[in-house]
Amino acid sequence: MKKIEAIIRRTRFEDVKEALLAADIEWFSYYDVRGVGKTREGRIYRGIVYDTSSIERILISIVVRDKNVEKTIQAVMKAARTGEIGDGRIFVIPVEDSIRIRTGERGDIALYNAEQEK
């Protein structure tokens, strides 16, 4: 199993969500996050552009079976890419175990309901 974390533009979230659902990735978490980097973003407030080093993004967190890693990465990349600086990053992290609290099931079987198996 792997945990895939993707930091994407807020404006691309709906496209990424739809791409993940189309790739049969049925569950993920997402969070509003801020980062600081060399690239600055301008914010417009009452018609004035303010320069800021704080960059607002969405962090998507998905745990998938090893066989679904590449299709998940490709779905995120295709939907999140604009070709501009600041499109984001994807991180792939090993997951040692997964436990379904309700049943005690362990391993990749705990990731999905039996009727959702693909």
Task: State what each model feature region is.
Residues 1-118:
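Positively charged, small/polar-rich N-terminal and surface patches that mediate targeting and assembly
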